[in-house]
């Protein structure tokens, strides 16, 4: 079929798509590129060429193909914008790993500008700005991204930039970040953690209470924050109950992006490949550490060990933190008449008792 001019296009399409399906990426790239050059209207050639280059981790080449496809209206503009942001970030990540920081920073900043809602680009750009001795530029970039899609990894990056800052400066910078998305859940959790870090538990409860009121099944992250707060209120029994609940509470996908022993968004080339289409086509992040049930970073105050193997409510495995708590004092079970599981409204009642003056 390839030798017959009338059937060449059909044969090339079948061959290229078969090569892509069987993992012969160089062959798929060669056949689809040739077809796309011969027939600029061949949408299949664009799709196959782009997919093969992405699968082969050829980020720069894939971006060039994407630009051509956008010009020929083979891909919608918003999808092209998001895909381009992922491709630039993937290439920036590769350059960063090779120690080529200047071009990596340039690409990451462009990616964050293209898609401020793409947190991995902002986190990488902020990290590279910090390495280049430009913390103010890093802060501004995170603030812009926070206004579009607040993410716990960006909060962590921002706090890293504030390390060693005076209290007044820290307050001013955190306030500036919070104003970018004052009603966002991540903003409230960031402020609650900061209050805990300062030892102002009443203010921390004031921020946490509405979040806990809003859900009947708080996540493991919220349970751990509640446990820390109870501990600081000198309520060890309630703290242990929250630790127990944390072991079986639902995980937060975004929180799993923070590796307790490494970088946030520590993606492999295969992860970047998936992101090109997940974020590029739908605007959704992937969460490899969530999928693999990797250890979680503990939210809140100070450096703490990760929570190993946190599990969903259907699984009975308990975290090390819970086992340590139970070793100190047995925890009453819900069928004990003197005990009941803690709910969000219980915290609200505790908060009210802390904030309201005693009645005479």
Task: Give the predicted meaning of each segment.
Residues 2-5, 33-40, 70-79, 108-116, ...:
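Solenoid-like repeat scaffolds
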Residues 9, 13-17, 83-85, 89-93, ...:
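Alpha-helical adaptor scaffolds
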Residues 22, 39, 56, 98, ...:
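Structural motif corresponding to the intra-repeat A-B loop/turn of tetratricopeptide repeats
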Residues 19, 53, 95, 128-129, ...:
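Residue at a conserved register position within TPR or TPR-like alpha-solenoid repeats
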Residues 11, 45, 79, 121, ...:
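TPR alpha-solenoid repeat register
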Residues 37-38, 43, 50-74, 135-153, ...:
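TPR/TPR-like (Sel1-like) alpha-helical repeat modules
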Residues 32, 66, 101, 108, ...:
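Inward-facing hydrophobic residues that define packing positions of alpha-helical scaffold repeats
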